[in-house]
Amino acid sequence: VYIKTDLGHRLMIRRYNDILSQTEHFAPSESACSKEELPEELQSLASYLNSCGFPCYQNTQAQYFPLGDDAFEVMCDELQKAEHFIFLEYFIVREGYMWGRILEILKEKVNAGVEVRVLYDGTCAVALLPYSYPEKLEKLGIACKMFAPLRPFVSTHYNYRDHRKIMVIDGKIGFTGGINLSDEYINRTSRLGHWKDTAIALRGDAVRSLTLMFLQMWDVSSCLLYTSDA
């Protein structure tokens, strides 16, 4: 039954806001560069982002990938280098070549003592993954959660999904953009013709924001607060 007052969504927003307020001290309080140091056409955007808790960073390199095909090989190479932790947060995770290859690397890293966490949107449980898939990954030593799992007839947050695509490795490199972990995003399959989605890799200080964003959403999904240094 879809409740008109949408209590589930209201509770989720309250929980998210509580976590933001309790973790804001992990984020830089201001941008690393002044407004005047930026090109004029970017100053308003930088001010807006800073007011939303996403400051501008220096000491960061950005690498652009015009296709998921290009990003995927770099993602796998960087995953192989992980020494401390791997965080994955994606809207879509679908079994196939792309996810299978990543999962094999994750299993290797878990066996090497690397902490691995996977967070994916609950809509995947409708047709892409078994509802019990988090338990399967947990047995492999991978911490896994679904964001807002869909329960037919009782869910109150059908329209509130986690569309992020974030991969963070050791807090040193992060990937984000438009590609999910599914074969069409690397043109391994062709469901709708040639698939073009872009991605970027960040190396340096700006990865801190991606790390914090992941941990905040993880806490929203688990009702727990992360208290260690991000």
Protein language model regions, located:
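N-terminal localization/anchoring segments of enzymes in phospholipid and broader phosphate metabolism
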Residues: 1-228
